[in-house]
Amino acid sequence: MVNIQKAAIIGCGFVGASSAFSLLQKGIFSELVLIDANKEKAEGEAMDISHGRPYAHPMKIYAGSYDDISDCSLIIITAGANQKPGETRLDLVHKNVAIFKSIIPEITKRGFEGILLVVANPVDILTYAALKISGYPKERVFGSGTVLDTARFRYLLSEHLQVASRSVHANIIGEHGDSELAVWSGANVAGIPINDFCELRGHYQHQESMERIYKTVRDSAYDIIQKKGATYYGVAMAVARIAESIVMNENAVLPVTSLMEGEYGLEGLCISVPTIVSQKGAEKVLEIPLSDEEKEKLLSSAKELKEVLDLSLIHI
């Protein structure tokens, strides 16, 4: 039987450990299992985070094994290799698909009935791999997608417009990567279209500002990696937000990456678009209105993903 308040994280690198810490702060689980090929690393992270429990929410966190996951409601997969200098994206895909081919069967043979949340990159490709390797229904396997990119987008817009980030409604969709796109046509603050709100705040050269903000969002990961070596806090908070919507059955709309079956004219790949996320998983993909230019950019993003996916299929 699934224990809705129990979760596991597979992979205790920067992202996995930061996600565990973020989940402790959220207080939505009573039990969290950390699994890593390096058992001592998982033990160390569990100890370090547990020592802060008196100042946070009560949550049992420990290093475990695949035998501990059968009753989890959620498994978060952050395990994967990082891209090395001179390595192509396809090289990275092949390495991480191989890692997933060792991880996913360990999950399925334990009778796991919960949700798989893929966070490892390239997340769109690896979500598709996890779906195919596991054989689970598509609702139960999805990825963090552009949830972080969307948070970056809203944050930067809020800074530019001097308004609370929670009052900014805007999405980044498509690939979690260079071909992602901003949905400007639907962006708004309190129902006021973003262009109109810019003028309300005294920004009349807003097209130039909007392009700069989009490029900053798209290139944020590169910039952060150049400055500090890796990104992990932001994505950890995105993971916790997704987990919260699952556990609390919020039906929150989040731009996760999941299998397309005709939506937006796409199928046979995973890509990020606004989706209702609940205890059922990626319950419903929403087809939001897009401008003609945005539709073209989404199709272009999907085409790039499909090309990589097709080259990777022999490894799945």
Locate predicted features.
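Rossmann-like NAD(P)(H) cofactor-binding subdomain of soluble oxidoreductases
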Residues: 88-154
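Aromatic pocket-lining residues of Rossmann-like dinucleotide-binding sites
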Residues: 23
